[in-house]
Amino acid sequence: MAVRSRRPWVSVALGLVLGFTAASWLIAPRVAELSEKRRRGSSLCSYYGRSATGPRADAQQLLPQPQSRPRLEQSPPPASHELPGPQQPEAAPGGPSFRSSPWQQPALLPQRRRGHTPEGATALPGAPAAKGEPEEEDGGAADPRKGGRPGSSHNGSGDGGAAVPTSGPGDFLYVGVMTAQKYLGSRALAAQRTWARFIPGRVEFFSSQQSPSAALGQPPPPLPVIALPGVDDSYPPQKKSFMMIKYMHDHYLDKYEWFMRADDDVYIKGDKLEEFLRSLNSSKPLYLGQTGLGNTEELGKLGLEPGENFCMGGPGMIFSREVLRRMVPHIGECLREMYTTHEDVEVGRCVRRFGGTQCVWSYEMQQLFHENYEHNRKGYIQDLHNSKIHAAITLHPNKRPAYQYRLHNYMLSRKISELRYRTIQLHRESALMSKLSNSEVSKEDQQLGRTPSFNHFQPRERNEVMEWEFLTGKLLYSAAENQPPRQSINSILRSALDDTVLQVMEMINENAKSRGRLIDFKEIQYGYRRVDPMHGVEYILDLLLLYKRHKGRKLTVPVRRHAYLQQPFSKPFFREVEELDVNRLVESINSGTQSFSVISNSLKILSSLQEAKDIGGHNEKKVHILVPLVGRYDIFLRFMENFESTCLIPKQNVKLVIILFSRDAGQESIKHIELIQEYQSRYPSAEMMLIPMKGEFSRGLGLEMASSQFDNDTLLLFCDVDLIFRGDFLQRCRDNTVQGQQVYYPIIFSQYDPKVTHMRNPPTEGDFVFSKETGFWRDYGYGITCIYKSDLLGAGGFDTSIQGWGLEDVDLYNKVILSGLRPFRSQEVGVVHIFHPVHCDPNLDPKQYKMCLGSKASTFASTMQLAELWLEKHLGVRDNRTLS
């Protein structure tokens, strides 16, 4: 009886199971068809649905697809927000029942499992479409890219509880760059060549529907450009921004975890951005960027309620995959209901309304997504030596390609410094492990792996002690021979100090958040600096800091700290400007009779060294020596004797050009002309040229007139009659002057008055004696110059309005710097400025007269010698120690 009583219940249960099964087979397809019709009810954005590239087997194996029927479209939205597109034809029988997209789809993702029902409009529960508006077109069940998975709650936990696959470095981030057709060859190309290469994913540029460069008839630049149909380059780019976001959603939603909308004038640090995003969960609805509320004039006019915000478009907006999944189906409604002309405000409103989130409220976002708020900003970030620049992930703006390349160059230089510092750390670890394992430490580890210390070098004599330079925030005090005792800190040292202090502050504030305090740098009170040639640069800095405590009782107090720092040198690197053809070089060496070879075991470089008399032969670049002159026949006679021994007898490849100024009838120039004719008759093959000029002496005018006689590839040497030089100087003039790049400005050794300096111990070595007693390096003079004619013209030439002595060389030097040429300055041991009495004309320009008096005072003797002479004359004290 008990068994029989159970049979009716078993029959009822079996009937329910069969009934539900039949309903799923008979009713579910009809429900899916009705849902499909409702999804097509919207006329907005339907043109931008997913594409159907023909009937696909994997699409047809899912559910039976109803045929598309003609239907009445809704009344179109206002023209200002309508997305135009051609009317789509009906789908072929048996084919997919959705409209085709004008974009070409990427490769299909793996087919979904049989039995999964297609996702509808992917509208969120609790965030439906507006009342009276049908849901946006989804693209149907045939498109697997939508990511439709039944049972997905869209609450940030992923797809129906399934684990989100971990993305690799190539499919992590998708960056869409908004640009315009006119910027494809400039801003967009600069972005592609700089930061876009370091993005862990894909970067594409979005422009208008018009093909790139079509109007110019030129091929488009090598950029991955997406032409958005129905979108133009008008500003504000609201439509372009929303359609770009929809393109990301339709094509790459399941391929990338994060999506970024960027401007073409932003700079993105790909490595820092990846590190930041890897720490977040892309399955949650996250909307990242610099939080904005509008400027002062726009407060209350953007349609934002209290507590609402948006992410500013300039530094970039970042969307998680879940935000796009929720928001994009409602983009049509967002476009129809806009309250402002700011596309970033409207995107933020759409995310907040349908994505279930808004731009994160975080103070750090203002630092990570950097917007330049400098006063009178010029379209670029001027100060790069800044902790804010180093901490930022995105930097905006860089309006010109040159600004983008400048910033990228700075970032690469910082990367190089970081890698070199890492090599130093590895050498230290290697040296430590060798010591702990009682093994021999390599020489490279011994040199580069030393711990920081000021005692690496131990002097054994008094003159081996390395002296420190004293510095303040603005001034440098030095005891070096070739430097003034007090000078302003130059730009190179200033940049080095700024970088050093910046690194120190980053080290101090490394754990500032956990410690609950922040320390800001105020200024350098004073400090010391020296360079150890074997180990690095050493600093002792007294820093004024500002201590800020933000945990517990808030406190802000100034503090002073001493910092003992060392910047160690890393391994040197060598680069060949021109690749060395070893086989050809060996043949030339073996065939030569006056050359020999040296093989360097460390560098493996085979080089040829020739005898000195072969240097500067006729196969070298010809040097045109230009000498302006007025009177001073005896000095000119000495110059020609030196020119004969240095150039004429060894047959140097040079040409001498004398610019001879004469007053009155030119009677004083007869001797000069006869002397030149005598040398021409003595050396017929030598090239010498005389350019006579009348009027007051003007060095700039004479050199400008003489240089105009030659073509642009001529190497010019601006010389003075007071100089004597050797052949090695001419070779360095050739080597250190690079056409279009570099100008050689040798620092000349100038003799003191021999009546003062040699009154007790006259020299026997000749004029090329370099010591404190015989002369000084004329580091303030720029008159002796090696430059190409084309570079002289490019810099602007001499100021021919300057009359008399001085200033024309300083003016040209400034022009060379401003023209972008690189001045090469160094002490030149092959040239000596022979002493001559200086006469300063009181009728000179006041600035020229002051410079002339300063030059005259510096030529008498050294400070120590003048002091001895004064003591001997006035006090009868005689001390020969300084002259010994």
Curated annotation (Swiss-Prot):
Bias (Low complexity): 60-69, 84-96
Function per UniProt: Has both beta-1,3-glucuronic acid and beta-1,4-N-acetylgalactosamine transferase activity. Transfers glucuronic acid (GlcUA) from UDP-GlcUA and N-acetylgalactosamine (GalNAc) from UDP-GalNAc to the non-reducing end of the elongating chondroitin polymer. Specific activity is much reduced compared to CHSY1.
Region Disordered: start-end pairs: 47-164, 437-456
Note on cofactor: Divalent metal cations. Highest activities are measured with Co(2+), Mn(2+) and Cd(2+).
Reaction(s) this enzyme catalyzes, per UniProt: 3-O-(beta-D-GlcA-(1->3)-beta-D-GalNAc-(1->4)-beta-D-GlcA-(1->3)-beta-D-Gal-(1->3)-beta-D-Gal-(1->4)-beta-D-Xyl)-L-seryl-[protein] + UDP-N-acetyl-alpha-D-galactosamine = 3-O-(beta-D-GalNAc-(1->4)-beta-D-GlcA-(1->3)-beta-D-GalNAc-(1->4)-beta-D-GlcA-(1->3)-beta-D-Gal-(1->3)-beta-D-Gal-(1->4)-beta-D-Xyl)-L-seryl-[protein] + UDP + H(+); 3-O-{beta-D-GlcA-(1->3)-[beta-D-GalNAc-(1->4)-beta-D-GlcA-(1->3)](n)-beta-D-GalNAc-(1->4)-beta-D-GlcA-(1->3)-beta-D-Gal-(1->3)-beta-D-Gal-(1->4)-beta-D-Xyl}-L-seryl-[protein] + UDP-N-acetyl-alpha-D-galactosamine = 3-O-{[beta-D-GalNAc-(1->4)-beta-D-GlcA-(1->3)](n+1)-beta-D-GalNAc-(1->4)-beta-D-GlcA-(1->3)-beta-D-Gal-(1->3)-beta-D-Gal-(1->4)-beta-D-Xyl}-L-seryl-[protein] + UDP + H(+); 3-O-(beta-D-GalNAc-(1->4)-beta-D-GlcA-(1->3)-beta-D-Gal-(1->3)-beta-D-Gal-(1->4)-beta-D-Xyl)-L-seryl-[protein] + UDP-alpha-D-glucuronate = 3-O-(beta-D-GlcA-(1->3)-beta-D-GalNAc-(1->4)-beta-D-GlcA-(1->3)-beta-D-Gal-(1->3)-beta-D-Gal-(1->4)-beta-D-Xyl)-L-seryl-[protein] + UDP + H(+); 3-O-{[beta-D-GalNAc-(1->4)-beta-D-GlcA-(1->3)](n)-beta-D-GalNAc-(1->4)-beta-D-GlcA-(1->3)-beta-D-Gal-(1->3)-beta-D-Gal-(1->4)-beta-D-Xyl}-L-seryl-[protein] + UDP-alpha-D-glucuronate = 3-O-{beta-D-GlcA-(1->3)-[beta-D-GalNAc-(1->4)-beta-D-GlcA-(1->3)](n)-beta-D-GalNAc-(1->4)-beta-D-GlcA-(1->3)-beta-D-Gal-(1->3)-beta-D-Gal-(1->4)-beta-D-Xyl}-L-seryl-[protein] + UDP + H(+)
GO function terms (MF aspect): glucuronosyl-N-acetylgalactosaminyl-proteoglycan 4-beta-N-acetylgalactosaminyltransferase activity; metal ion binding; N-acetylgalactosaminyl-proteoglycan 3-beta-glucuronosyltransferase activity
Lineage summary: Eukaryota, Metazoa, Chordata, Craniata, Vertebrata
Membership in a protein family: Belongs to the chondroitin N-acetylgalactosaminyltransferase family.
Lumenal side: 29-884
Xref: Gene3D superfamilies: 3.90.550.50, Spore Coat Polysaccharide Biosynthesis Protein SpsA, Chain A (3.90.550.10)
InterPro entries membership: Chond_GalNAc, CS_glycosyltransferase, Nucleotide-diphossugar_trans
Cytoplasmic side: 1-7
GO biological process: chondroitin sulfate proteoglycan biosynthetic process
Recorded GO CC terms: Golgi apparatus; Golgi cisterna membrane
Bilayer disposition of the protein: Single-pass type II membrane protein
Transmembrane regions listed in the UniProt entry: 8-28
Cofactor(s) for this UniProt protein: Co(2+); Mn(2+); Cd(2+)
Residues glycosylated per entry: N155, N281, N712, N880
Organism: Mus musculus
Key words of the record: Glycoprotein, Golgi apparatus, Membrane, Metal-binding, Signal-anchor, Transferase, Transmembrane, Transmembrane helix
Domain of life per record: Eukaryota
Known EC number: 2.4.1.175, 2.4.1.226
Name of this chain's protein: Chondroitin sulfate synthase 3
